[in-house]
Structures are given as structure tokens and as C-alpha cells.
């Protein structure tokens, strides 16, 4: 199983394109773990609009980018973990 761990904070500008670029490369048995650091824009709504069972989101209060990545990693279940910043668009073949 692959876990892609993403840290977000007010990432509404790129989040949809980014999630699409990741989901197109992972299997149904893989996961996208998103840790949101207290976004106050539409990031959460855009993530939830996917209705994809591979996506798990953890939304909390603002801490720091490091804490945010650690939070995503601690919730990951995969044997292999990829990290993704909130504005990364994954080109084909990354996974």
C-alpha cells in the first residue's frame, strides 16, 4: 500500500489539480492522507467534494508546516510514503 501524505493550509488555488494528479497515479487500495493546518478558505470544501474513499482528511488548528506533515505521516497506513506540498502537481510516472 502507498500513502501519499499532503500538508495543506489555505491551498484552494491548487488543491483540485493537485489531488487529481495524485489520484490518477494511485490504486484503489492506496491512500491520500491530507492534514490541513486550519485553513480558512475553501480548501476543505474542495477536498470533500471528491467523495473518494482513498482520501482521508484531518483538519485541525494552525500549528506549523512541520507539525502538519508529521500529523499526516502518523495517520498513514502504507508501507511506502510519498510527501506532497499543497501546490505540487504530480507529473505522470511519479508513483
Regions found by a protein language model. Give the residues of each.
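A conserved acidic beta->alpha catalytic loop
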Residues: 36-45
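Active-site acidic Asp-centered loop
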Residues: 37, 84-86
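Acidic donor-binding/catalytic loop of UDP-sugar-dependent glycosyltransferases
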Residues: 42, 88-95
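Short aromatic/hydrophobic "clamp" motif used to bind/position activated sugar donors
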Residues: 81
